[in-house]
Amino acid sequence: ARPITDIGTENISRIATGFSEFDRVLGGGIVPGSVTLIAGEPGIGKSTLLLETAGNVARLTAFATERNTVLYISGEESQAQVRMRASRIGAMEPNLLLASTTDLSTVLGLIEQFKPALAIVDSAQTIVSQDVDGISGGSTQVREVASALIDTAKTLDIPVLLVGHVTKDGSIAGPRTLEHLVDVVCQFEGDAETALRMLLSLIHI
């Protein structure tokens, strides 16, 4: 432990997402060690937004001496499917690492192995821990997944963007405590009949 007066904040360097509005919603960019939940209805474009963000951050960190990779982990699509989407949106960066798994221990192992500048997990409802009972997307599983990701993010000082689905009534699928576990909750909304999308910050710690 250290005296609070000895702890400075000047060395906290936020990571730019490559989208000025996204950065603004996040208070200037992604804070290292933070966990941000991006919530929205299925099909609204959460995965595409975060894959574009992954490509942008990978491009910006390509020449860094350390933590010069971005890790995108999908529990919903295969590596080939993610690659096709990345090619379509211009996110084909050699230091953007893709993985497809629904196993929590594998997810944590990948983050610990590569120690990326940014880790993206898509989604909280598809990752499963073998240490607890319950189906994927259930309250017990989602809480365990979120808690483990938060612990890893804080320990390794690696920011994590976590996708979360929203139910028909507009609430985030899984336990309500999920919203209070993470550092930031962003709601991704849109009009089904237009290409207009809005990103709102609901909780920002």
Task: Explain the meaning of each model-derived region.
Residues 33, 41-44, 48-57, 61-148:
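Conserved inter-motif catalytic segment of the P-loop NTP-binding fold
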Residues 203-205:
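Conserved small/polar residues in nucleotide/adenosyl-binding loops
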Residues 177-187:
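A short helix-turn-beta junction within AAA+ P-loop NTPase domains corresponding to the substrate/partner-engaging
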Residues 141-161, 187:
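Substrate-engagement module of ASCE P-loop NTPases
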